[in-house]
UniProtKB/Swiss-Prot annotation:
Full protein name: 2-hydroxymuconic semialdehyde dehydrogenase
pH dependence statement: Optimum pH is 8.3 for the oxidation of 2-hydroxymuconic semialdehyde, and 9.6 for that of benzaldehyde.
Active site: 254, 288
Pathway(s) annotated for this protein in UniProt: Aromatic compound metabolism; benzoate degradation via hydroxylation
Assembly: Homodimer.
Species this protein is from: Pseudomonas putida (Arthrobacter siderocapsulatus)
Record function comment: 2-hydroxymuconic acid semialdehyde can be converted to 2-hydroxypent-2,4-dienoate either directly by the action of 2-hydroxymuconic semialdehyde hydrolase (HMSH) or by the action of three sequential enzymes, the first of which is HMSD. Can oxidize not only 2-hydroxymuconic semialdehyde and its analogs but also benzaldehyde and its analogs.
GO BP field: benzoate catabolic process via hydroxylation
Keyword Translocase appears in the UniProt entry: no
Catalysis: reaction(s): (2Z,4E)-2-hydroxy-6-oxohexa-2,4-dienoate + NAD(+) + H2O = (2Z,4E)-2-hydroxyhexa-2,4-dienedioate + NADH + 2 H(+)
Keyword NAD included in the entry's annotation: yes
Keyword tags: Aromatic hydrocarbons catabolism, NAD, Oxidoreductase, Plasmid
Family classification: Belongs to the aldehyde dehydrogenase family.
Protein backbone atom coordinates (compact mmCIF):
# COMPACT_ATOMS: atom_id res chain seq x y z
CA UNK A 1 0.00 0.00 0.00
CA UNK A 2 1.36 3.40 -0.99
CA UNK A 3 2.12 6.11 1.54
CA UNK A 4 1.50 9.44 -0.19
CA UNK A 5 3.39 12.40 1.26
CA UNK A 6 3.56 16.10 0.52
CA UNK A 7 6.19 17.38 -1.92
CA UNK A 8 7.83 20.46 -0.41
CA UNK A 9 11.09 22.08 -1.51
CA UNK A 10 12.02 19.03 -3.55
CA UNK A 11 11.46 16.50 -0.77
CA UNK A 12 8.72 14.09 0.24
CA UNK A 13 7.47 15.28 3.62
CA UNK A 14 5.08 13.67 6.09
CA UNK A 15 2.60 15.59 8.23
CA UNK A 16 3.85 16.61 11.67
CA UNK A 17 0.43 15.78 13.09
CA UNK A 18 0.59 12.23 11.82
CA UNK A 19 -2.90 12.60 10.33
CA UNK A 20 -3.59 10.39 7.33
CA UNK A 21 -6.62 9.55 5.21
CA UNK A 22 -7.48 6.72 2.84
CA UNK A 23 -7.07 6.78 -0.91
CA UNK A 24 -9.74 4.41 -2.22
CA UNK A 25 -10.04 2.69 -5.61
CA UNK A 26 -13.33 3.66 -7.28
CA UNK A 27 -13.40 0.32 -9.10
CA UNK A 28 -13.69 -1.90 -6.05
CA UNK A 29 -13.79 0.33 -2.98
CA UNK A 30 -10.52 -1.01 -1.62
CA UNK A 31 -7.99 1.21 0.13
CA UNK A 32 -4.96 1.60 -2.16
CA UNK A 33 -3.00 4.22 -0.26
CA UNK A 34 -2.67 6.30 2.87
CA UNK A 35 -2.34 10.05 2.35
CA UNK A 36 -0.75 12.56 4.71
CA UNK A 37 -3.13 15.43 5.51
CA UNK A 38 -1.45 18.82 5.64
CA UNK A 39 -1.83 21.10 8.61
CA UNK A 40 -1.02 24.78 8.72
CA UNK A 41 2.64 23.92 9.30
CA UNK A 42 3.01 21.98 6.04
CA UNK A 43 1.11 24.59 4.02
CA UNK A 44 3.25 27.35 5.49
CA UNK A 45 6.41 25.40 4.71
CA UNK A 46 5.29 24.94 1.10
CA UNK A 47 4.50 28.65 0.68
CA UNK A 48 7.81 29.65 2.25
CA UNK A 49 9.65 27.24 -0.05
CA UNK A 50 7.91 28.75 -3.07
CA UNK A 51 8.71 32.29 -1.93
CA UNK A 52 12.37 31.40 -1.41
CA UNK A 53 12.56 29.75 -4.84
CA UNK A 54 11.33 32.96 -6.47
CA UNK A 55 14.49 34.64 -5.19
CA UNK A 56 16.69 31.76 -6.29
CA UNK A 57 17.83 30.44 -9.68
CA UNK A 58 14.29 30.09 -11.06
CA UNK A 59 13.61 33.80 -10.73
CA UNK A 60 16.89 34.66 -12.42
CA UNK A 61 16.45 32.37 -15.44
CA UNK A 62 15.59 33.69 -18.86
CA UNK A 63 12.36 32.67 -20.55
CA UNK A 64 14.35 30.41 -22.88
CA UNK A 65 16.11 28.68 -19.98
CA UNK A 66 12.83 27.97 -18.21
CA UNK A 67 11.34 26.74 -21.48
CA UNK A 68 14.15 24.22 -21.90
CA UNK A 69 13.47 22.78 -18.45
CA UNK A 70 9.71 22.65 -19.01
CA UNK A 71 10.27 20.76 -22.26
CA UNK A 72 12.11 18.16 -20.20
CA UNK A 73 9.14 18.03 -17.81
CA UNK A 74 6.87 17.32 -20.79
CA UNK A 75 9.17 14.53 -21.93
CA UNK A 76 9.18 13.14 -18.39
CA UNK A 77 5.39 12.96 -18.38
CA UNK A 78 5.52 10.94 -21.58
CA UNK A 79 8.18 8.61 -20.22
CA UNK A 80 6.19 7.88 -17.05
CA UNK A 81 2.68 8.16 -18.42
CA UNK A 82 1.80 4.61 -17.44
CA UNK A 83 2.60 5.51 -13.84
CA UNK A 84 0.32 8.54 -14.06
CA UNK A 85 -2.52 6.31 -15.23
CA UNK A 86 -1.82 3.87 -12.44
CA UNK A 87 -1.77 6.78 -9.98
CA UNK A 88 -5.29 7.69 -10.94
CA UNK A 89 -6.69 4.17 -10.77
CA UNK A 90 -4.75 0.92 -10.35
CA UNK A 91 -4.92 -1.19 -13.48
CA UNK A 92 -6.02 1.74 -15.61
CA UNK A 93 -5.27 1.09 -19.26
CA UNK A 94 -6.51 4.41 -20.71
CA UNK A 95 -5.75 8.08 -20.19
CA UNK A 96 -8.25 10.23 -18.32
CA UNK A 97 -8.92 12.00 -21.57
CA UNK A 98 -12.70 12.32 -21.73
CA UNK A 99 -12.78 10.33 -24.96
CA UNK A 100 -10.00 12.25 -26.70
CA UNK A 101 -7.78 10.14 -28.94
CA UNK A 102 -4.59 12.13 -28.35
CA UNK A 103 -4.16 10.62 -24.86
CA UNK A 104 -1.18 12.17 -23.10
CA UNK A 105 -0.32 14.83 -25.73
CA UNK A 106 -2.42 17.52 -24.04
CA UNK A 107 -0.56 17.07 -20.77
CA UNK A 108 2.78 17.46 -22.56
CA UNK A 109 1.44 20.44 -24.46
CA UNK A 110 0.48 22.23 -21.26
CA UNK A 111 4.21 22.63 -20.63
CA UNK A 112 5.58 22.87 -24.17
CA UNK A 113 3.01 25.24 -25.67
CA UNK A 114 3.11 27.75 -22.84
CA UNK A 115 6.90 27.58 -22.55
CA UNK A 116 7.23 28.35 -26.25
CA UNK A 117 4.47 30.95 -26.24
CA UNK A 118 6.36 33.19 -23.84
CA UNK A 119 9.41 33.19 -26.09
CA UNK A 120 7.32 34.80 -28.83
CA UNK A 121 5.18 37.36 -27.00
CA UNK A 122 6.05 40.96 -27.78
CA UNK A 123 5.96 43.69 -25.14
CA UNK A 124 4.07 46.89 -25.85
CA UNK A 125 5.89 50.18 -26.40
CA UNK A 126 4.64 53.72 -27.10
CA UNK A 127 6.39 56.95 -27.93
CA UNK A 128 4.78 60.12 -26.60
CA UNK A 129 5.19 63.83 -27.06
CA UNK A 130 6.35 66.07 -24.20
CA UNK A 131 6.15 69.87 -23.81
CA UNK A 132 9.90 70.28 -24.35
CA UNK A 133 9.72 68.39 -27.62
CA UNK A 134 12.18 65.70 -26.54
CA UNK A 135 9.51 63.08 -26.03
CA UNK A 136 9.33 60.00 -23.86
CA UNK A 137 9.17 56.26 -24.33
CA UNK A 138 6.72 54.01 -22.50
CA UNK A 139 7.28 50.28 -22.56
CA UNK A 140 5.72 47.38 -20.73
CA UNK A 141 7.52 44.54 -19.01
CA UNK A 142 5.96 41.46 -17.51
CA UNK A 143 7.13 39.98 -14.25
CA UNK A 144 6.00 36.80 -12.46
CA UNK A 145 3.02 37.30 -10.19
CA UNK A 146 4.76 35.39 -7.39
CA UNK A 147 3.46 32.41 -5.44
CA UNK A 148 0.40 30.84 -7.06
CA UNK A 149 -2.03 28.62 -5.16
CA UNK A 150 -3.25 25.91 -7.55
CA UNK A 151 -6.35 24.02 -6.42
CA UNK A 152 -7.10 21.31 -8.94
CA UNK A 153 -10.00 18.86 -9.33
CA UNK A 154 -10.20 15.08 -9.39
CA UNK A 155 -12.06 14.42 -12.62
CA UNK A 156 -9.14 15.00 -15.01
CA UNK A 157 -6.35 15.31 -12.46
CA UNK A 158 -3.24 15.44 -14.63
CA UNK A 159 -4.77 17.43 -17.49
CA UNK A 160 -6.35 20.15 -15.38
CA UNK A 161 -3.44 20.45 -12.97
CA UNK A 162 -0.84 20.84 -15.73
CA UNK A 163 -3.17 23.28 -17.51
CA UNK A 164 -2.53 25.61 -14.56
CA UNK A 165 0.97 24.64 -13.48
CA UNK A 166 2.43 24.76 -17.01
CA UNK A 167 1.77 28.45 -17.76
CA UNK A 168 2.37 29.48 -14.15
CA UNK A 169 5.89 28.06 -14.22
CA UNK A 170 6.54 29.25 -17.77
CA UNK A 171 5.85 32.79 -16.56
CA UNK A 172 8.42 32.39 -13.78
CA UNK A 173 6.10 31.84 -10.84
CA UNK A 174 6.37 29.20 -8.13
CA UNK A 175 3.35 27.12 -7.15
CA UNK A 176 1.76 25.35 -4.22
CA UNK A 177 -0.65 22.71 -5.51
CA UNK A 178 -3.54 21.37 -3.45
CA UNK A 179 -4.89 18.47 -5.52
CA UNK A 180 -8.22 16.85 -4.82
CA UNK A 181 -8.18 14.43 -1.92
CA UNK A 182 -9.66 11.88 -4.35
CA UNK A 183 -6.61 11.88 -6.67
CA UNK A 184 -3.55 12.76 -4.57
CA UNK A 185 -0.83 10.66 -6.16
CA UNK A 186 -0.82 12.41 -9.55
CA UNK A 187 0.45 15.69 -8.12
CA UNK A 188 3.18 14.05 -6.05
CA UNK A 189 4.32 11.98 -9.03
CA UNK A 190 4.58 15.17 -11.09
CA UNK A 191 6.92 16.50 -8.41
CA UNK A 192 9.27 13.59 -9.10
CA UNK A 193 9.14 14.39 -12.82
CA UNK A 194 9.87 18.06 -12.09
CA UNK A 195 12.86 17.17 -9.95
CA UNK A 196 14.29 14.82 -12.58
CA UNK A 197 13.87 17.54 -15.23
CA UNK A 198 15.93 20.02 -13.23
CA UNK A 199 13.19 22.23 -11.81
CA UNK A 200 14.78 23.85 -8.73
CA UNK A 201 13.54 22.86 -5.29
CA UNK A 202 10.63 24.97 -4.09
CA UNK A 203 9.34 25.93 -7.52
CA UNK A 204 6.71 23.17 -7.43
CA UNK A 205 5.18 22.12 -4.12
CA UNK A 206 2.26 19.84 -3.22
CA UNK A 207 0.17 19.67 -0.05
CA UNK A 208 -2.57 17.10 0.44
CA UNK A 209 -5.83 17.38 2.31
CA UNK A 210 -9.42 18.53 2.17
CA UNK A 211 -11.16 21.90 1.88
CA UNK A 212 -12.52 23.40 5.08
CA UNK A 213 -10.25 23.28 8.15
CA UNK A 214 -7.62 21.47 6.08
CA UNK A 215 -5.05 22.12 3.37
CA UNK A 216 -7.46 23.95 1.06
CA UNK A 217 -8.55 26.49 3.66
CA UNK A 218 -5.02 26.91 5.03
CA UNK A 219 -3.72 27.65 1.52
CA UNK A 220 -6.42 30.16 0.60
CA UNK A 221 -6.02 31.92 3.95
CA UNK A 222 -2.24 32.17 3.72
CA UNK A 223 -1.21 35.84 3.43
CA UNK A 224 1.90 35.17 1.34
CA UNK A 225 0.12 33.63 -1.66
CA UNK A 226 -0.25 36.15 -4.48
CA UNK A 227 -3.02 34.58 -6.58
CA UNK A 228 -5.21 31.50 -6.86
CA UNK A 229 -6.40 29.39 -9.75
CA UNK A 230 -9.19 26.91 -9.11
CA UNK A 231 -11.37 24.45 -10.99
CA UNK A 232 -14.35 22.98 -9.18
CA UNK A 233 -17.80 23.63 -7.75
CA UNK A 234 -19.30 27.11 -7.77
CA UNK A 235 -19.80 27.14 -4.00
CA UNK A 236 -16.14 26.36 -3.37
CA UNK A 237 -15.16 29.08 -5.83
CA UNK A 238 -17.18 31.60 -3.84
CA UNK A 239 -15.37 30.52 -0.66
CA UNK A 240 -11.99 31.00 -2.34
CA UNK A 241 -13.02 34.45 -3.59
CA UNK A 242 -13.95 35.53 -0.08
CA UNK A 243 -10.63 34.30 1.30
CA UNK A 244 -8.64 35.93 -1.50
CA UNK A 245 -10.40 39.25 -0.97
CA UNK A 246 -8.37 39.65 2.22
CA UNK A 247 -5.15 41.02 0.84
CA UNK A 248 -6.77 41.72 -2.56
CA UNK A 249 -5.35 38.60 -4.23
CA UNK A 250 -6.42 37.75 -7.76
CA UNK A 251 -8.40 34.64 -8.64
CA UNK A 252 -9.06 32.65 -11.79
CA UNK A 253 -12.08 30.39 -11.36
CA UNK A 254 -13.47 27.72 -13.70
CA UNK A 255 -16.61 26.58 -11.95
CA UNK A 256 -19.67 24.39 -12.40
CA UNK A 257 -22.02 24.25 -15.31
CA UNK A 258 -25.18 22.69 -16.66
CA UNK A 259 -24.18 22.81 -20.28
CA UNK A 260 -26.57 22.55 -23.20
CA UNK A 261 -26.24 20.64 -26.42
CA UNK A 262 -28.40 21.96 -29.29
CA UNK A 263 -29.15 19.60 -32.15
CA UNK A 264 -30.84 21.04 -35.24
CA UNK A 265 -32.74 18.97 -37.78
CA UNK A 266 -30.19 19.76 -40.48
CA UNK A 267 -27.31 18.26 -38.48
CA UNK A 268 -25.13 15.40 -39.59
CA UNK A 269 -26.89 12.83 -37.40
CA UNK A 270 -23.90 10.50 -37.16
CA UNK A 271 -21.65 13.30 -35.93
CA UNK A 272 -24.28 14.61 -33.52
CA UNK A 273 -24.87 11.18 -31.98
CA UNK A 274 -21.17 10.42 -31.64
CA UNK A 275 -20.48 13.85 -30.18
CA UNK A 276 -23.36 13.73 -27.72
CA UNK A 277 -22.42 10.25 -26.54
CA UNK A 278 -19.03 11.67 -25.67
CA UNK A 279 -20.30 14.90 -24.13
CA UNK A 280 -22.82 13.05 -21.95
CA UNK A 281 -20.95 9.89 -20.97
CA UNK A 282 -17.18 10.33 -21.38
CA UNK A 283 -15.25 9.86 -18.15
CA UNK A 284 -18.49 8.54 -16.64
CA UNK A 285 -20.04 11.98 -17.13
CA UNK A 286 -17.47 13.59 -14.86
CA UNK A 287 -16.43 16.40 -17.20
CA UNK A 288 -17.26 20.01 -16.39
CA UNK A 289 -17.85 20.67 -20.10
CA UNK A 290 -20.32 17.79 -20.54
CA UNK A 291 -23.86 18.31 -21.80
CA UNK A 292 -26.41 17.15 -19.25
CA UNK A 293 -29.10 19.08 -21.16
CA UNK A 294 -29.69 18.20 -24.81
CA UNK A 295 -32.22 20.12 -26.91
CA UNK A 296 -33.21 18.46 -30.18
CA UNK A 297 -35.31 19.99 -32.97
CA UNK A 298 -38.66 18.22 -33.02
CA UNK A 299 -38.58 16.67 -36.55
CA UNK A 300 -35.61 14.48 -35.57
CA UNK A 301 -36.34 14.14 -31.85
CA UNK A 302 -37.59 10.53 -31.83
CA UNK A 303 -34.84 9.30 -34.15
CA UNK A 304 -32.17 11.08 -32.13
CA UNK A 305 -33.40 9.65 -28.82
CA UNK A 306 -33.53 6.14 -30.27
CA UNK A 307 -30.00 6.33 -31.64
CA UNK A 308 -28.54 7.90 -28.50
CA UNK A 309 -30.22 5.14 -26.46
CA UNK A 310 -28.61 2.51 -28.66
CA UNK A 311 -25.24 4.19 -28.29
CA UNK A 312 -25.50 4.42 -24.50
CA UNK A 313 -26.53 0.79 -24.22
CA UNK A 314 -23.55 -0.22 -26.36
CA UNK A 315 -21.12 1.22 -23.82
CA UNK A 316 -19.30 -1.58 -22.03
CA UNK A 317 -19.06 -1.09 -18.29
CA UNK A 318 -15.95 -2.66 -16.86
CA UNK A 319 -12.87 -2.45 -14.72
CA UNK A 320 -9.84 -0.43 -15.80
CA UNK A 321 -7.79 -3.36 -17.07
CA UNK A 322 -10.58 -4.73 -19.27
CA UNK A 323 -9.41 -3.98 -22.84
CA UNK A 324 -13.00 -3.94 -24.11
CA UNK A 325 -14.44 -1.66 -21.43
CA UNK A 326 -15.06 1.99 -22.32
CA UNK A 327 -17.16 3.07 -19.34
CA UNK A 328 -15.74 3.09 -15.84
CA UNK A 329 -16.87 4.01 -12.33
CA UNK A 330 -17.48 7.35 -10.67
CA UNK A 331 -14.51 8.70 -8.74
CA UNK A 332 -15.70 7.63 -5.27
CA UNK A 333 -18.66 6.69 -3.12
CA UNK A 334 -19.57 10.31 -2.45
CA UNK A 335 -20.81 10.88 -6.03
CA UNK A 336 -21.98 7.25 -6.02
CA UNK A 337 -24.52 8.41 -3.43
CA UNK A 338 -25.27 11.75 -5.10
CA UNK A 339 -25.82 10.64 -8.71
CA UNK A 340 -28.42 7.90 -7.99
CA UNK A 341 -30.31 10.40 -5.84
CA UNK A 342 -30.87 12.42 -9.01
CA UNK A 343 -31.82 9.24 -10.85
CA UNK A 344 -34.59 8.77 -8.28
CA UNK A 345 -35.51 12.46 -8.41
CA UNK A 346 -36.04 12.18 -12.16
CA UNK A 347 -38.51 9.32 -11.66
CA UNK A 348 -40.28 11.24 -8.90
CA UNK A 349 -40.57 14.24 -11.25
CA UNK A 350 -42.24 12.15 -13.95
CA UNK A 351 -39.36 11.47 -16.32
CA UNK A 352 -39.44 8.78 -18.94
CA UNK A 353 -36.32 6.69 -18.35
CA UNK A 354 -35.08 5.95 -21.85
CA UNK A 355 -32.22 3.83 -20.59
CA UNK A 356 -30.27 3.23 -17.40
CA UNK A 357 -31.37 4.96 -14.25
CA UNK A 358 -29.81 2.59 -11.77
CA UNK A 359 -26.75 0.74 -10.55
CA UNK A 360 -25.39 -2.10 -12.69
CA UNK A 361 -24.78 -5.58 -11.36
CA UNK A 362 -21.04 -6.09 -11.17
CA UNK A 363 -18.88 -9.14 -10.45
CA UNK A 364 -18.21 -9.81 -6.78
CA UNK A 365 -14.70 -8.35 -6.88
CA UNK A 366 -16.11 -5.03 -8.19
CA UNK A 367 -19.25 -4.90 -6.08
CA UNK A 368 -17.73 -2.30 -3.77
CA UNK A 369 -17.01 0.11 -6.61
CA UNK A 370 -18.71 3.40 -7.47
CA UNK A 371 -20.67 2.09 -10.45
CA UNK A 372 -23.77 3.66 -12.02
CA UNK A 373 -25.51 3.16 -15.35
CA UNK A 374 -25.35 5.64 -18.24
CA UNK A 375 -28.80 7.23 -18.18
CA UNK A 376 -31.06 9.15 -20.57
CA UNK A 377 -34.37 10.81 -19.70
CA UNK A 378 -37.10 12.63 -21.55
CA UNK A 379 -40.28 14.31 -20.37
CA UNK A 380 -39.06 16.43 -17.45
CA UNK A 381 -40.28 19.95 -16.77
CA UNK A 382 -37.76 22.73 -17.33
CA UNK A 383 -37.73 23.57 -13.61
CA UNK A 384 -36.95 20.03 -12.41
CA UNK A 385 -33.80 19.90 -10.29
CA UNK A 386 -32.54 17.21 -12.65
CA UNK A 387 -32.61 19.78 -15.45
CA UNK A 388 -31.36 22.81 -13.51
CA UNK A 389 -28.64 21.39 -11.20
CA UNK A 390 -25.25 19.99 -12.13
CA UNK A 391 -25.28 16.24 -11.47
CA UNK A 392 -21.77 15.45 -12.68
CA UNK A 393 -22.64 11.94 -13.67
CA UNK A 394 -23.25 9.92 -16.86
CA UNK A 395 -26.70 11.23 -17.71
CA UNK A 396 -28.61 13.68 -19.86
CA UNK A 397 -32.16 14.90 -20.34
CA UNK A 398 -33.35 15.32 -23.93
CA UNK A 399 -36.08 17.85 -24.73
CA UNK A 400 -37.57 18.86 -28.08
CA UNK A 401 -37.66 22.44 -29.38
CA UNK A 402 -39.53 24.03 -32.28
CA UNK A 403 -37.54 27.11 -33.25
CA UNK A 404 -34.06 28.55 -33.15
CA UNK A 405 -35.23 31.23 -30.75
CA UNK A 406 -36.66 28.65 -28.35
CA UNK A 407 -33.43 26.64 -28.39
CA UNK A 408 -31.38 29.73 -27.51
CA UNK A 409 -33.78 30.71 -24.74
CA UNK A 410 -33.65 27.21 -23.23
CA UNK A 411 -29.87 27.03 -23.42
CA UNK A 412 -29.52 30.42 -21.69
CA UNK A 413 -32.19 29.81 -19.04
CA UNK A 414 -29.86 28.78 -16.19
CA UNK A 415 -27.39 30.83 -14.12
CA UNK A 416 -24.46 28.87 -15.56
CA UNK A 417 -22.49 29.59 -18.71
CA UNK A 418 -19.49 27.34 -19.14
CA UNK A 419 -19.89 25.57 -22.48
CA UNK A 420 -22.30 24.52 -25.21
CA UNK A 421 -22.26 22.29 -28.29
CA UNK A 422 -24.26 23.11 -31.44
CA UNK A 423 -24.93 20.58 -34.17
CA UNK A 424 -25.98 21.97 -37.56
CA UNK A 425 -24.79 21.93 -41.17
CA UNK A 426 -26.04 25.50 -41.72
CA UNK A 427 -22.95 27.69 -41.33
CA UNK A 428 -24.90 30.94 -40.99
CA UNK A 429 -27.10 29.42 -38.29
CA UNK A 430 -24.04 28.06 -36.50
CA UNK A 431 -22.46 31.51 -36.27
CA UNK A 432 -25.77 33.18 -35.41
CA UNK A 433 -26.67 30.80 -32.59
CA UNK A 434 -23.14 30.53 -31.21
CA UNK A 435 -23.02 34.31 -30.90
CA UNK A 436 -26.16 34.33 -28.75
CA UNK A 437 -25.29 31.47 -26.38
CA UNK A 438 -24.28 32.77 -22.95
CA UNK A 439 -21.24 30.57 -22.42
CA UNK A 440 -17.49 30.96 -22.39
CA UNK A 441 -16.97 28.15 -24.91
CA UNK A 442 -19.23 27.14 -27.79
CA UNK A 443 -18.39 24.20 -30.01
CA UNK A 444 -19.97 23.74 -33.44
CA UNK A 445 -20.14 20.18 -34.76
CA UNK A 446 -17.58 19.10 -32.17
CA UNK A 447 -17.03 18.78 -28.45
CA UNK A 448 -13.94 19.09 -26.24
CA UNK A 449 -11.85 20.24 -29.19
CA UNK A 450 -9.23 22.46 -27.56
CA UNK A 451 -6.47 24.72 -28.84
CA UNK A 452 -4.30 25.80 -25.90
CA UNK A 453 -3.80 29.22 -27.50
CA UNK A 454 -7.48 30.12 -27.12
CA UNK A 455 -9.41 31.52 -24.17
CA UNK A 456 -10.92 29.06 -21.70
CA UNK A 457 -13.37 29.95 -18.94
CA UNK A 458 -17.01 30.39 -18.02
CA UNK A 459 -19.52 33.19 -17.72
CA UNK A 460 -22.25 33.86 -15.14
CA UNK A 461 -21.84 31.45 -12.20
CA UNK A 462 -19.47 29.25 -14.19
CA UNK A 463 -16.38 31.27 -13.51
CA UNK A 464 -14.31 34.42 -13.52
CA UNK A 465 -11.39 35.12 -15.80
CA UNK A 466 -9.87 33.34 -18.77
CA UNK A 467 -6.83 31.14 -19.15
CA UNK A 468 -5.17 29.81 -22.28
CA UNK A 469 -2.71 31.47 -24.64
CA UNK A 470 -2.03 35.13 -23.88
CA UNK A 471 -4.87 35.05 -21.34
CA UNK A 472 -2.77 32.77 -19.14
CA UNK A 473 0.11 35.18 -19.62
CA UNK A 474 -2.08 38.03 -18.40
CA UNK A 475 -3.17 36.16 -15.28
CA UNK A 476 0.19 34.70 -14.27
CA UNK A 477 2.19 37.92 -14.72
CA UNK A 478 2.08 41.52 -13.56
CA UNK A 479 2.43 44.12 -16.31
CA UNK A 480 4.61 47.06 -15.36
CA UNK A 481 4.83 50.25 -17.42
CA UNK A 482 8.19 52.04 -17.52
CA UNK A 483 8.24 55.63 -18.77
CA UNK A 484 11.62 57.03 -19.84
CA UNK A 485 11.96 60.75 -20.52
CA UNK A 486 14.17 61.27 -23.55
Amino acid sequence: MKEIKHFISGELVGSASGKLFDNVSPANGQVIGRVHEAGRAEVDAAVRAARAALKGPWGKMTVAERAEILHRVADGITARFGEFLEARMPGHRQAEVAGQPHRHSARRANFKVFADLLKNVANEAFEMATPDGAGALNYGVRRPKGVIGVISPWNLPLLLMTWKVGPALACGNCVVVKPSEETPLTATLLGEVMQAAGVPAGVYNVVHGFGGDSAGAFLTEHPDVDAYTFTGETGTGETIMRAAAKGVRQVSLELGGKNAGIVFADCDMDKAIEGTLRSAFANCGQVCLGTERVYVERPIFDAFVARLKAGAEALKIGEPNDPEANFGPLISHKPREKVPSYYQQAVDDGATVVTGGGVPEMPAHLAGGAWVQPTIWTGLADDSAVVTEEIFGPCCHIRPFDSEEEAIELANSLPYGLASAIWTENVRRAHRVAGQIEAGIVWVNSWFLRDLRTAFGGSKQSGIGREGGVHSLEFYTELKNICVKL
